Amino acid sequence: MTIHQLSPESQWKIVSSSFIYGPVAAVRELLDNSIDSGAKKVFIDVDSTTGGCEYISVKDDGSGVDIIDRPSMCLEYTTSKMSSLGDISILTTLGFRGEALFLLSNLCNQKGSMQVETKTADDVIGEKWLVDSKGGITNGKRYKVSCPVGTTVILRKLLGGLRARYLEISSRPRKTFDELIYLINHYSLIHRNIRFYFSLVSLQKNGAIERKQMQETLDPKISRARSLSLLARLKKPVPLNFIVEENFVIDEKINLDLILPRMVPESDVINIKRRFKFLSVNERALSLNLETGKTISKLLSSIYRDFSLLDPMVWFINLNCDTKLLDVNIEPEKNDVMIKSFEVIFKKIENKLKLLLEERIGIETNMLGDKHVQPSINEKTSPALVIPTPDAENEISKGCGAVSGKDKTDIPQKNSDLIVPTFYDEANLENTTIVAATPSPTKFSEDKALDEQTQLTISSYRSSSSGSMASEDSTNWRHNFQQELSENSEVAGAGSSTLPSSLTYNYIETIPENEDLELSKDASISNPFMITKIRNVNKKLSENLLEAKRTSCGDANKRGMPNERQLSNTEKKELIKLQQTYGKRNNTVDMTIPRNSKKKVTDNYIKKASCMHKTRPKLMHFSEYTNNYVYTLKNEKIVKHDSDNFAKETLWLRSRDDATSPSSSLLQALRAHVKKPGHIEATTNEWCLFTPDSP
């Protein structure tokens, strides 16, 4: 195969496709130009269907492009940021090659187009034009357009000439959106004086924008640490989550702007699983997948592991160093740098970060009472409390009882509540077992009575502990299931007849009286003996609770209602008779009460009605869900009865139910013949008056 030269068109297609992989790289190049132009607001619009393969627009409010520079704006190897290779060592801008716009125009013109719109502060009106595949103005035509000061670049069908890449990237727009959001957030954290707006747009068939929806933006008025907290959606204050340092000096040529997480349990940054890691050098965003970013990310994780902390997932580091120590021209996307004497600088950064974390997190853990705080080097002893055994106390008390009364006065009285720490050597404590015990009651001589305070103290000691292990003074000790099983059981196969089992003759099940039994961490829940014991305890507890509920209900019934009035036997009989008399309807007569006594009973009931009905209605509720509490619902409205109205009603009832009453019989006969609606009223003379209703 002979060697031949590629055509210029094929050359630039190959170069441009290798430099501009997709929409993310194209947006990055346009953002660099907007930042270099001094913009304060940058708007990024991407089509929502293909993730930028069909439409990308980057608009800024920078200085714009002068009229004399517009024809050469997109030509290859044209730039306003440097004039020779030596200027790279003193470079302060993000762009410097002069080929990004040319490569973008070459890619877009294969199937689409590239449009530029700009205006400077000195221009009366702006201009727009299309860029051809060689970076020049298409047909040399520029059009006047009304636009604000700044520059807008619109890319259409960026990957139209690369079919395979277009299908691959356009089929996963969600991944492209995530990468763009990460890139824009990275730039927002680095350049806090610029506000970036990221939006998704929908296109019509003719390419016009149909709908636009903003997705991401960060207010530049808030601090960088607060912005990072918003990105990670942290709720707690920034000082509790982050360590913030500005111009953290490493040496005379390097300093850091950093935000490191406090990976302590009190912060909520410890729960973040998604990565929010941002690294930059001289405000140039770096990728964590390349050499420099990967090395610093691993360094930070190793430092946190040395402090027994989780790997940090949210942090920001901007390394400011002399430009003469950097080489930024090592990657096509300019997202990696080479640092001179990187190993030495790397070691300095590691030592400084360790000191910073030790100072900040170490002070915090000490304030929070962290158990990992190491004691001082000179401290060789540790305090221990000396608790006398019961036998030792008895010996002391016996000795005190043998002393005469004269000698007792010479002995100073010591405060029994005072605990004096005794220091032991740590080497001697290795084989020492510390047992916390409840002190037994102290014995006193017969001629000395216990004062009230001592009696209260001893009684409180006895009531504070509970359990099933009894000591000499009948004091129960707190224990767990595992300890009780180990004491009451024997080795399997030993043939002991005292083995606590349900198969034992005359076996009586014993249920522990302690309701505060704890399950040991070493106990196995799958053990059938353990399950049986737990069920027995739960059964006993449920029985006790049921008994307590019954007792509380019984007490409530015994107490009764405080507002209830107790009636005498005579009143109860009269009330029952009255209810039987007036409880029946349909002109039936109660034969249990003589007719001549009805009026007398009614009059007595009228006299007693006012006092009998002054009690307030009350309803008592009890349920197993009320936790043994009985609550009462009261009706505060007192029922008031008018004796006159009540007398009229009873008179009418008596007249209606009495078949022998002439007035009642007459009215019943009249109502059958008079076919008019009316009403019946009782007069004061015990007559009934029928009045027809007026038509």
From Swiss-Prot:
List, alphabetically, the Pfam families matched.
DNA_mis_repair (PF01119), HATPase_c_3 (PF13589)
Q: What are the entry keywords?
A: DNA damage, DNA repair, Nucleus
Q: Which gene carries the instructions for this protein?
A: MLH2
Question: Lineage of the native species?
Answer: Eukaryota, Fungi, Dikarya, Ascomycota, Saccharomycotina
**The keyword Oxidoreductase is assigned to this record:** no
Matching InterPro entries, A to Z?
DNA_mismatch_repair_CS, DNA_mismatch_S5_2-like, HATPase_C_sf, MutL/Mlh/PMS, MutL/Mlh/Pms-like, Ribosomal_Su5_D2-typ_SF, Ribsml_uS5_D2-typ_fold_subgr
Q: Where in the cell is it found?
A: Nucleus
Q: Keyword check for Nucleus, yes or no.
A: yes
Q: What is this protein called?
A: DNA mismatch repair protein MLH2
Which species is this UniProt entry from? Saccharomyces cerevisiae (strain ATCC 204508 / S288c) (Baker's yeast)
Q: Which Gene3D superfamilies match?
A: 3.30.230.10, Histidine kinase-like ATPase, C-terminal domain (3.30.565.10)
Q: Name one GO cellular component term.
A: MutLalpha complex
Other comments on record: Present with 72 molecules/cell in log phase SD medium.
Q: How does it assemble?
A: Heterodimer of MLH1 and MLH2.
**What is the role of this chain?**
Involved in DNA mismatch repair (MMR), correcting insertion-deletion loops (IDLs) resulting from DNA replication, DNA damage or from recombination events between non-identical sequences during meiosis. Component of a MutL heterodimer with MLH1, which probably forms a ternary complex with the MutSbeta heterodimer that initially recognizes the DNA mismatches. This complex is thought to be responsible for directing the downstream MMR events, including strand discrimination, excision, and resynthesis.
Give the protein family. Belongs to the DNA mismatch repair MutL/HexB family.
GO molecular function per UniProt: ATP binding; ATP hydrolysis activity; ATP-dependent DNA damage sensor activity; mismatched DNA binding
| Source superkingdom | Eukaryota
One GO biological process term is:
meiotic mismatch repair
